[in-house]
Amino acid sequence: PQADDPIALLDRMDAAAVRAAAAAAPSVRVPLEALGLPADLGAAHVAGGTNFRAHGDEVGVDEPFLFPKRVAPTRWESTVPAATRLDYEAELCFVALRPIRGSEGAGDLGVVLCNDFTDRWLLVRGMLLGPGVMGTRGFADAKGRPGFLPMGPFLVVPDDLERWLQSVELELWVNGALRQRAPASDMIWAVREMLARALADREAYRYAGADVPLLQERGVLPARALLLSGTPAGVIFRAPN
């Protein structure tokens, strides 16, 4: 990691020391376009599907599920590659600040705004429907193309993540039109439950022609890996009537 990487900084200093250093430092103005990725991050992540009830209703899926998101994040203003049926999904990316082995590790997560882009045509052709299999086929390929994980420039590390999330609202706008809006509190699986399910997962997921685990080391969410929250209603795709 770079010397100014915030995750490396938090590994060396506690939150109080970081706040004290920030308060003592002079203010600096930085143009928005100069801001890049907020930290050095990995390329093997865990994502939640239909974790907002209204989004599950609009796509015809009843329960949340998990799947691997095997792609490196890109800058917030990066061009997204063209796809047959490209779709957006505004999400919260929970960032592991250190290796996490239990749901109590939810306190070791930061948060970044991200977009879980999808090739819906590739997804629909490859997915399996039904309890226990949702997410195991189609999702990793349809959401794992290079450039399909643009990320905001700000890493937020709350003192109390779960309390902080009660005040967060997700919005996505397209060409001046509001498409998605929901409070983070609408998540069906809260972050602690998502984390527990990911750490306990033993399923095989199809990606790039091979079976892969949800986590590269089962039972461990490694430092710099992401846990994606799922998205609110308002995506382009709709289930047929």
Where are these regions (language model features)?
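Catalytic-pocket segment enriched in acidic/His residues
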Residues: 16-20, 26-28, 123-241
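A generic local secondary-structure boundary/capping motif
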Residues: 35-37, 56, 79-86, 92, ...
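Short catalytic-site patches enriched in acidic/histidine residues
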Residues: 54, 65-82, 95, 144-159, ...
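Short helix/loop capping segments that flank catalytic or ligand/cofactor-binding pockets
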Residues: 55-57, 76-77, 102-105, 121-123, ...
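Hydrophobic alpha-helical segments and helix pairs
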Residues: 64-119
